[in-house]
Amino acid sequence: MVDITFKQGNVLCGAPVDASHVEQALGGTPEPTLRTACHLDVIISNPPYISEKSYGNGTTARSVRMFEPRIALVPPVIGDALKPPLHQQEDIFYYHILSLSFKMRVKLVILECGDHSQGERVASLCRALAAQYSQVDDLCISIWPANDATVNDSAREVSEPCMVIVQRSGLGNDSACDQPHH
């Protein structure tokens, strides 16, 4: 039997991405297992991903703006020390989450994105970070649902939320690069 532990934390807490940063991001009070050898298998995240512009110009549904706190929707503007080389401010969390996943060699990362355009940016960012961390050959990066997926015989809207799925192969996950089934 395998123990499963769920933790939440702040990847923008300002510390470098390493095991001690993970401890800080996961609440500052490390579990005994984290003190000796920090190990993560899965990261699942639905970070704030709506741009300031989309939030303010009515692109974001009124029901979302009325019932979700702004901090859950729009990423904060952060100082230059933590600011990665991104084209879109709303992608800030993805950079830090993916960097953490590469440093910790996480087996599976699932990230919700606002639409396929953002999903493509996140997948591209993931490929760039994989090259930076020399882990290109280990990964399968996919966007689900795929742009060509159909729902009730009609094309899925590319403006709907999607998931970027990053799977590491060679770690007991031989089917890592199988495409998601619909």
Language-model-derived ranges and their functions:
Residues M1-S45:
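S-adenosyl-L-methionine
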Residues C13, Y49, D115:
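Short, glycine/acidic-enriched loop or turn micro-motifs at the edges of active sites
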Residues A15, K53-S54, G119:
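Glycine/Thr-rich phosphate-binding loops of Rossmann-like dinucleotide-binding domains
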Residues E23-A25, T59-M66, R127-L129:
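Glycine-rich, phosphate-binding/catalytic loops in enzymes
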Residues R35-A37, A61-I71, Y94-R105:
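A short glycine-rich, Lys/Arg-flanked "PGG" loop and its adjoining helix->strand segment in the class I
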Residues P47-I92:
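Mobile active-site "lid"/loop adjacent to the S-adenosyl-L-methionine
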Residues P76-V151, E157-R168:
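Conserved Class I SAM-dependent methyltransferase catalytic core
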Residues Q167-H182:
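Flexible, glycine-/basic-rich loop-and-beta segments that form/coincide
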